[in-house]
Amino acid sequence: MTIAHYHLPGLFEFYELYRRFLPLYRNHPEYFYDWCDIGSIYGAPADCLWGGGRVGSGESSARDVLALMRDYGISPRLTFSNSLLRAEHLRDARCNALCQMLNDGGNGGVILHSDLLLRYLQKTYPNLYFVSSTTKVLTSFPDLQAELERAEFRYVVPDFRLNHALEKLNAMPQGQKDKVEFLCNECCYFGCRDRRACYEAVSRKNLGEGGDEHRCHAPDAAAGYRFSKAMENPGFIGVADIQRTYLPMGFENFKIEGRELGSALVLEFLLYYLTKPECQLKVREEIYLDNMLDLF
């Protein structure tokens, strides 16, 4: 049976959630779909110079985080997708220490944008694998194929607006399909032309550099992320899409975004993508829901 591999958000940011969820996932397989598993969990601690995509907020100990991943056989990934790195930034002690820990663990990866950082990590930490970040905003199919041809990347995350270019995707050779990692639940406006500028603003912020704050001009931007709205996005990939379309076509890797969101919403992602509908209430009860919980 072909298995869908999910790549989940919040390696550091949602450590406490995963510390509760993963034992349940292991001990009650009957709650969860048997056609998918957890391929990796990605993220970055707060104030990481090499960080990008989103400003990291995780405060959990790296040793605790990596020990949890090791206990459950899950690949940890560092999100180091800053697109504006310069040579002097490569000396950052904290980011290097994190890479060394993943390198020593043997199954860790780095999500990145910068070729400068890629070359440095290849030379310095040979046990790491690399993921080409969606912050490259690969909206052109030829650009995606060129990125997939780069042997240094194990996976490539295209822009979500290519998710349903099914005729072109299906025509790919299997070797390229194996490397595609679809971003499933993006809430960004499908017609957005500022996505690259948004990511660059985050990169500047992580470097501590000045510059105007990026202002999103998308319709309904003030409402923030809503999963219900993401489900209406033309680029959304849902459970039925994965089972009926992408797996039969030979695609197996699916990324769930959400590092900047709250843990309650990330739990909803875990329920929707991993958990059988009839067991979702049981998972909620195991994680947080009891008969004395008040919302108001």
Question: Language-model segments: which ranges?
Answer:
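Active-site pocket-lining/capping segments in soluble small-molecule metabolic enzymes
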Residues: 1-143, 147, 153-296
